Amino acid sequence: MDINEIIMYEQGDLSDDDTIVLFQELIDSGDAWKLQGHYGRQAASLIEAGLCHKAGEAH
């Protein structure tokens, strides 16, 4: 996890594509479920929308 990307996300400075990449990295590492609740909810929403996939699943 890159803390600078987290900060950029929280400040609204990431593009939509970069946000999806960030959340996929958080999902793959399991960190999405360890951070504050917003991250897990957002990760689940992105998975449900088909923009991200569950850890271990092919793209």
Each predicted region: which residue ranges?
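Catalytic phosphate/metal-binding cores of nucleic-acid and nucleotide-processing enzymes, i.e., regions
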Residues: M1-H59
